[in-house]
Amino acid sequence: MDKQAVATGLFAAGVIRFGAFRLKLHESVPDAPLSPFYIDLRLVRSYPDLMDRVTDLMIGLMRGLKFDLIADVPTAGTPFAAIIAHKLRMPMITPRLEHKQHGSRARVDGAYTAGQTAIVLDDLVTHSESKLEAVQILVDQGLVVTDVVVLVDREQGGVQALKAAGLDCHAAFRLSELLEIYKEQRLITPEQFEAISDYLVPRTVANGPTSGLP
């Protein structure tokens, strides 16, 4: 599959926006610099042809990995996982990041058996907190998790954090890879390229790192 064509499709869909954005990071580090970009992969669900190509790309990363179930990280990862599960004719489950207080109070939606292996799918990885939370819920229910698959790695420590937790993260694109494609195709200016590249360089303030999105 032509990854450059997929990258161009993502740009055309508006998933990468430029400006000055407050992120989840600013809740704990209010003095952190504003992000010069924002990646909104939730938009992909509105473009069926693009979603088809994106999920095929993610399926390619899953070839050779061993798993019995596909688990999403709600809610951003849900459409990707649902379509991939349908394409592969594999069962899908969903860990509940918010504890259900009614009905069965299940921590995981869907049918599964303790001892089965689940592969976790999400849209992107930054600092990995939501991935680690989802994995812990699955493990607490007796499932095995060894691999995480995402569309974009923002290259802000998430892959390393998952590795430290014993998880292999497979990304279709690194952010720097997308930026190089967009720069070569003149979809972004040299100034935008430099602004994002500078932002991704780790910095520290009193309360911790300033780049990225938890």
Name what the model sees in each region.
Residues 1-121, 125, 129-214:
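PRPP-associated nucleotide enzymes
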